[in-house]
């Protein structure tokens, strides 16, 4: 199978961001204070998550990407035992803090060929701004690809929606006009009634 590099595009990426922080260590004893393991940290690995991961993937295609994310960065700390590979604990920080809000402005759309939205429903992308963006892009023939955890997707009129099977079952409202791609795990991807 051959892979063709996409032509150079100017991409606007909008979404929520996080840092995925992996704490690797060992648990060799139980705490005398409570019946819990004592974790001794050996190594930390930090990865960009949510929209920042999408940003890195788009850059790998040598695309010109402008990334706009909320002010608050969620941190997801995962504690993993080296020996057993057991995921012991996850601690989320800044999960409920107020984030800046995206406000649609046509001036940010100069030279944009494509919009990608990575919405984890953390408060950065409010429906009215998403509706304005979707309407503008439809009028200008700019494709909008959306991966959203919102249960009401009606603000993404005329967009291409990508959700997973669990999210699909939780959505309460869709736009009037849209394309839908549903990822179904190892089975592949569902599009217009066909599995790919």
Mark where each language-model region is.
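Ribokinase/PfkB-type carbohydrate-kinase core domain
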Residues: 1-28, 33-34, 40-196
